[in-house]
Swiss-Prot record:
Catalytic activity: UMP + diphosphate = 5-phospho-alpha-D-ribose 1-diphosphate + uracil
Source species of the chain: Stenotrophomonas maltophilia (strain K279a)
E.C. numbers: 2.4.2.9
Name of the gene this protein is made from: upp
Organismal lineage: Bacteria, Pseudomonadati, Pseudomonadota, Gammaproteobacteria, Lysobacterales
SUPFAM superfamilies, per the entry: PRTase-like
Protein name as annotated: Uracil phosphoribosyltransferase
Length: 210
């Protein structure tokens, strides 16, 4: 499995700012989108291109264009939406596929409740967006969903990832690539990443549970 912890100074600076518990909703949301852009830049560095000849100001010129079908971006509801605008600012022609999962309180396993995927997935790179890769259960379920629909090349983009989640995904889907701003120390007994960011969904949307 390809695992990339992006060590670019701007990425490290921004993820550091997000760890501040006193950070405003506005600033947290803006940083999530900015990091979405930077991480997507890294995740798309190996896209295939093909030559294309067009009419330049001084005559014909050959340029490079992205080959194949448009990328699909796959935000996981709801927190993944907090990174979507940043990724689309980099890839404005991307198709958007949306998935939603919730935990079954008896089995503790993620259960899909919403799925709206673009067509021709077998021809597209799929970029999954979720601020946190914690236990890996949600990501595994999302990858399962995409592969059933025909997706072959899948990458996950996360603000923060836990080693336990990475290993869980690696055991089931070693062909998937992971891009993250930080691989943190561990999960606590409630499945939260330490030191982490807290509940990224609540911090992006300005809500609190309970």
């Amino acid at each position: 499995m390809k695992i990339v912890e992006v060590r670019h100074p701007l990425v490290q600076h921004k993820i550091g700012l997000m760890r501040n518990a006193a950070l405003s909703t506005k600033d947290f949301r803006e940083l999530a989108n900015e990091l979405g852009t930077l991480l997507a830049y890294e995740a798309t560095a190996d896209l295939d291109t093909e030559p294309h000849t067009l009419a330049g100001w001084a005559g014909p010129v050959t340029v490079q264009r992205i080959a194949g079908a448009k990328i699909t971006v796959v935000p996981i509801l709801r927190a993944g939406l907090g990174m979507l605008s940043g990724v689309l600012s980099l890839i404005p022609a991307a198709r958007v596929s949306v998935v939603g999962l919730q935990r079954d309180e008896e089995t503790l396993q993620p259960v899909p409740y919403f799925e709206r995927l673009t067509g021709r997935l077998e021809e597209r790179d799929a970029l999954i967006l979720d601020p946190m890769l914690a236990t890996g259960g949600t990501l595994i379920a999302t990858i399962d969903m995409l592969k059933r629909a025909g997706a072959r090349r899948i990458k996950g983009i996360f603000l923060v990832a836990a080693p336990e989640g990475i290993e869980a995904v690696k055991a089931v889907h070693p062909d998937v690539e992971i891009y993250t701003a930080a691989i943190d120390a561990q999960l606590n007994d409630k499945g939260y990443i330490l030191p982490g960011l807290g509940d990224a969904g609540d911090r992006i949307f300005g809500t609190r549970v309970g």
